[in-house]
A protein has these predicted regions:
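Surface-exposed, charged secondary-structure patches
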Residues: 72-110
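Hydrophobic pocket/interface hotspot
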Residues: 33, 44-45, 53, 68, ...
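Short, low-complexity N-terminal intrinsically disordered segments enriched in polar/charged residues
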Residues: 4, 8-51
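Short beta-strand edge/turn micro-motifs at domain boundaries
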Residues: 117-141
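A mature extracytoplasmic/lumenal domain signature
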Residues: 49, 59, 83, 88, ...
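A short gly/proline-enriched turn/hairpin at secondary-structure junctions
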Residues: 37-38, 52-63, 74-78
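Short, solvent-exposed loop/turn segments at secondary-structure boundaries
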Residues: 59-60, 109-113
Length: 141
């Protein structure tokens, strides 16, 4: 009986540690994504967004992964900095949801430079041991 309890305890502990590790990986991915947007690192952005990724802007406009990364590369979306205020991450197996609140300084779609209180809600999937963004919805807070 003691052996069974020990095995169950170790199994539960492993699951809890894995969930924490996943949350840490997702938090890092979120912060790094903003750094990559500022640096216009399209290679990394391409790697961390799934091929079927879709961004829904606060206006309701949808951008595919290719359109989104192209807009960053050509300056349609110019990101200058991001100060992260809050993240909430929920992990369920190989799927996760991240809601991040950041003060983002950007100039978008021909507008002037402005600091936005931007909330992004992401859906993520873990493929081959790596977390990827599959969907994002932008709003303000």
């Amino acid at each position: 009986m003691n052996r069974l309890i020990t095995i169950l305890f170790l199994g539960i502990t492993t699951i809890i540690m894995q969930a924490k590790t996943d949350k840490e990986q997702i938090e890092t991915l979120y912060r790094d994504m903003y750094e990559d947007m500022v640096a216009k690192d399209t290679v990394t952005l391409n790697r961390v967004h799934a091929d079927d990724f879709v961004l829904t802007h606060m206006t309701g406009m949808h951008q595919s992964k290719q359109e989104y990364i192209r807009a960053i590369a050509n300056g349609t979306l110019n990101y200058y900095s991001a100060e992260h205020e809050q993240t909430e991450i929920k992990v369920s197996g190989n799927h996760a949801t991240l809601t991040g609140r950041s003060r983002v300084t950007a100039a978008v779609f021909g507008g002037g430079r402005h600091t936005w209180h931007l909330q992004l809600t992401f859906q993520l999937v873990k493929r081959n041991g790596q977390w990827m963004f599959t969907n994002a919805r932008a709003s303000t807070y």
